[in-house]
């Protein structure tokens, strides 16, 4: 055994030496190696931070220095979550994968507040655990003046007054914008919302993530909910944005170029974006939701500190509703106690994007994963019927100013500048304070004079509510965040996403177009992206370090296998050893040992919550179970209801249930009497809603691939098909048995269903589980 250890050790050392020599040789010729990763060279003055200049010497230009080592290192996301985790064992450092009890700094809800309140009351709660933790903002259906909607708003107001909850009325602004501008979302804290775009808070260094309605009710009642710390991906920005390129172009590029679920169900930490304005960061973080991430967090840097200093000074001089939360004392504390990722923090993956190589980009139609350079779409002369400068993503004062600039510059050539004939241009500020800033600057009036139609500060057409929805066959271009089929109107309409200036230019010209501000930098031929940090030497050194770690682990495994081989042989020869013995999962009372049914197959990836349950029904609180079953999957396939039957097992592609936090995406499938959903992978927020509402789900990528292989030559390609295949999920044995149409069958091991999840589902969902705990 000593000889074996020595041989393995010598082998590892030899390989390490060879790879180290390769690194040394690469480092000595750095000037040649790194040049291919530069975006462009120029002799003109560069407006950039010192560290970003092309020829600035840095230590890494001469040799790679390994970052200092911290014991049990944590990412920024893990550090922030650590501060808001309750009940941890002494000395416990949380890491990705851990389940924790999370007590967020703030929990925001919007028009879904009343359904949450009903859940809160139904579980037997009578008092909000911490009324300073909770914020209500009415923002989604603010144009709806029906008696039913006004009554709901009145009930929310009365509930807030009774319990002393901070609340903002309809028309004040979009909840996520209020959370940021009023200082509820704060750097280094955790703020959640029962809305999927709470990721936006990451733009100011706050860990913002979505919860669902039942979670919110639990937070109201107990101050906390459960949360699994996600794997963390690090995204490094290199270079600086050229003029005419915005934060919206950055996030569209990330969604479209890294479109293979690289960050699905991850939290993202951004680095290297020191030059990005805060409004651009808010846009980028906001749409990390569409990228598939659970959070998108920027670091606290000088740009952010300066931004808060400005707001604190304004509050000190003129007062303001946020003065108790945004003031110099609090900014001082923030500056002195910045949370940062440990230098040797471990990330699930690392990606980079060279900002200098970006150009204006448009997403669509009807998908954020289709990203096309603006110049390509301009060449197609795509007519536009409706344009939208709305949403929490891009309707702040800076966005309105950018749109107004388009019309101001056009007015230099033609004083009477108007929106193109046949185009409707809708504008709604992210909040009243942002609208007031735009009004004082004259930008709001410029857009109105050009013919823009003003909507109240709120979500409106972004969520498919109110005035200006897309009609069948129409084309729309929006500065919002989501262009799923049917979300902004008709399922036969086409929706594109773009920056505010592109939206304004398109409204002006009557077709998808830009204002002409972008000038391609010399030498830029393509967008530079990749895995790693974008620093060739550092990435190469880290890859060698990973290789050494892998060798050591393999050596340990080889030694352990050799040391135990005799014992293993003896055990295998023992008559008591049961061949194929399998561990069995304990099944709790009330939970089925097996779930079985015929497979109905929806062969699409990224089926989103709008596809599962249309947004136009989301804020109708009295929709019957029968109606929910009728409209289930309507935006994905209008024929779904004809194919799917009670008791069927729905099998879908990858990333099923991405999109919003609406719980009806789960309850509509239950209304359709579908007991189990099988997919290649699930969006995290759908998984959370499923568990909370007692819908079972299991990931079986092999089944999806097998079905696709079987039907790959089918020329019809229906969105939904009955397969004649049968599936049995043996929960006790943690496996699925699939019987294909020809009678052949096969098995696949799946993850064990833990007891706590069984208990919630057996109780009929989290709401009933919490009620049982309270009653006990």
Swiss-Prot record:
SUPFAM superfamilies: Aconitase iron-sulfur domain (SSF53732), LeuD/IlvD-like (SSF52016). It is found in: Mitochondrion. [4Fe-4S] cluster binds at residues 392, 459, 462. Catalyzes the reversible hydration of cis-homoaconitate to (2R,3S)-homoisocitrate, a step in the alpha-aminoadipate pathway for lysine biosynthesis. It is an enzyme of class 4 (lyase). This is Homoaconitase, mitochondrial. PANTHER family: HOMOACONITASE, MITOCHONDRIAL, HOMOACONITASE, MITOCHONDRIAL-RELATED. It catalyses: (2R,3S)-homoisocitrate = cis-homoaconitate + H2O. It comes from Gibberella zeae (strain ATCC MYA-4620 / CBS 123657 / FGSC 9075 / NRRL 31084 / PH-1). Its cofactor is [4Fe-4S] cluster.
